[in-house]
């Protein structure tokens, strides 16, 4: 079990409230999104992994926002491709 110093994580993010927001978002990603942790898991809970990632500067609000945007774009692109295939659109303008 890795030791997490919450204060280090707070210092990275700036305040405890934002830290909790970011850590919970990241923990949810790890839990539901099948995302691979950026640090060794060491049998830690998702929340602990999230805090460790933040503490090491691997996860910030900007990084999370950018990742979510990218995922949405990929999702939309995949859906668009699927709809195009079903609609039998053979004229792809990319």
Curated annotation (Swiss-Prot):
Sorted UniProt keywords: DNA-directed RNA polymerase, Nucleotidyltransferase, Transcription, Transferase
GO cellular component: DNA-directed RNA polymerase complex
Key word Transcription present: yes
One GO biological process term: DNA-templated transcription
Enzyme class, UniProt record, top EC level: transferase
Recorded GO MF terms: DNA binding; DNA-directed RNA polymerase activity
Similarity-based family: Belongs to the RNA polymerase subunit omega family.
Subunit structure: The RNAP catalytic core consists of 2 alpha, 1 beta, 1 beta' and 1 omega subunit. When a sigma factor is associated with the core the holoenzyme is formed, which can initiate transcription.
Role, per record: Promotes RNA polymerase assembly. Latches the N- and C-terminal regions of the beta' subunit thereby facilitating its interaction with the beta and alpha subunits.
Protein name: DNA-directed RNA polymerase subunit omega
Species this protein is from: Photobacterium profundum (strain SS9)
Gene: rpoZ
């Amino acid at each position: 079990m890795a030791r997490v110093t919450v204060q280090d994580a707070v210092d990275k993010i700036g305040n405890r409230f934002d830290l909790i927001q970011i850590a919970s978002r990241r923990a949810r990603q790890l839990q539901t999104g099948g995302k691979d942790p950026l640090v060794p898991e060491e049998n830690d809970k998702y929340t602990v992994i999230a805090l460790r990632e933040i503490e090491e500067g691997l996860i910030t609000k900007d990084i999370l926002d950018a990742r979510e945007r990218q995922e949405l774009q990929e999702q939309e692109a995949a859906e668009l491709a699927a709809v195009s295939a079903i609609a039998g659109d053979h004229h792809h303008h990319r």
